[in-house]
């Protein structure tokens, strides 16, 4: 793929991970910006399989195959998400923020690193 595209590995091959992969593909429909390279999953039984045309790898395998890839966290359970954050951060890897182009937001909204905001979301400041 083009060197201008940002490689993204989606951590989590379950429901939210697959939804996140679709969200990233939907972002690309508006402006081709990302290259989805794989799913990362801790379930070793999934390693080597293909889901929605993407290979499923372990974290170390993914980093070896795609050392420049940013991570998008597609893990829905809060405790598991914290564990993923710690594991990825401990390896010195970075999370990508994904904001769909059809998000409406105030210019005063601050979005943190690794945030995922889906299409149709409206963000505003309330008092």
Predicted regions and their residues:
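Glycine-rich adenosine-cofactor-binding loop
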Residues: 4-24
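Active-site catalytic pocket residues across diverse enzymes, especially alpha/beta-hydrolases
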Residues: 24-28, 88
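Short active-site oxyanion
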Residues: 7-9, 35-37, 68-71
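Phosphate-bearing ligand-interacting subdomains
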Residues: 44-105
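Short, flexible hinge/linker loops that cap or flank conserved catalytic cores
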Residues: 1-2, 65, 109
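A structural motif detector for beta-strand N-caps
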Residues: 97, 103, 109, 113-121, ...
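NAD(P)-binding Rossmann-fold cofactor-contacting core
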Residues: 11, 27-48
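Short alpha-helical
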Residues: 15-18, 79-80, 110
């Amino acid at each position: 793929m083009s060197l201008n595209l940002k490689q993204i590995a989606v951590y989590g091959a379950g429901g939210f991970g697959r939804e996140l992969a679709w969200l990233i593909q939907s972002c690309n429909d508006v402006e081709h910006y990302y290259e989805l390279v794989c799913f990362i999953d801790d379930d070793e039984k999934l390693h080597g399989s293909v889901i929605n045309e993407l290979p499923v790898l372990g974290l170390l395998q993914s980093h070896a195959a795609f050392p420049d890839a940013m991570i998008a966290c597609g893990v829905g359970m809060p405790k598991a998400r914290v564990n993923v954050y710690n594991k990825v951060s401990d390896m010195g890897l970075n999370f990508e923020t994904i904001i769909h182009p059809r998000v409406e937001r105030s210019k005063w909204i601050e979005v943190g690193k690794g945030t995922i905001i889906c299409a149709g979301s409206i963000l505003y400041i309330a008092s």
